[in-house]
Amino acid sequence: MDTTFFRRYSGVLVMMDSKTDKVVSYHFVRMEKDIYYKLALNRLREKGYIIQSITCDGRRGLMKELFNTPVQMCQFHMVAIVMRKLRKKHQSQAGKELKIIAKSLVKSSKNDFYRRLYAWFIKHEDFLKERSDKGNEKGYFPYKHRNVRGAYASLKYYMNYLFTFEKHTEMNIEHTTNRLEGLFKYLKRQLNNHNGLTKKRKVMFIKDFLNKKSC
């Protein structure tokens, strides 16, 4: 499941069955919120759907509440989170090495990935603990390398969700939301071929497109 936006405050939340590639639910939204995903999931359950697993882009509040449903964090979104925290021109050696480890995620097993991540942490532990020499107005000495710490903290936070597909091999859980991303790109290309549509007709076009994908 994922949400895409066509302009500010104009998006659509879509849920797809990975086994059939069919859209099973979609809802127009103004912004991306956990509550919208919860409502969409509840509507599916009310219709009799059995939700065996969920692959999403890391909705923290939502993940905590889905106790009985295996949740897979999209690995490409995880890599993107790390890359945003460690910009393209990031200079520290620790940050550069962490970017390399993050990029290896989609081709790694859980054991291999976290063995490399733990080795990285041991190597750079002192670096991560470095604090500024100047205290702030509260007398607190902040950490120097907050971007690197933040990237590492994100990888640790999602640790239990990055390799759910390995734990439940019988379910064939998707480890990325690539199918939906591909659907969104195709939808937007089709919309671009119909420039000049009014807002109402654009909504009708999107509905027709997604309805055909649910057949």
Predicted regions mapped to residue ranges:
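Acidic/histidine-rich catalytic cores and adjacent linkers
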Residues: 49-60, 66, 96-215
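Alpha-helix capping at helix-to-loop junctions
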Residues: 21, 84, 88-92, 103, ...
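Short, charged/polar low-complexity linear motifs in solvent-exposed/disordered segments
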Residues: 18, 41-44, 81, 89, ...
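RNase H-like nuclease fold core
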Residues: 1-60, 64-67, 158, 179
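Conserved beta-strand -> loop -> alpha-helix junction used to position metal-binding or nucleic-acid-contacting
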Residues: 53-99
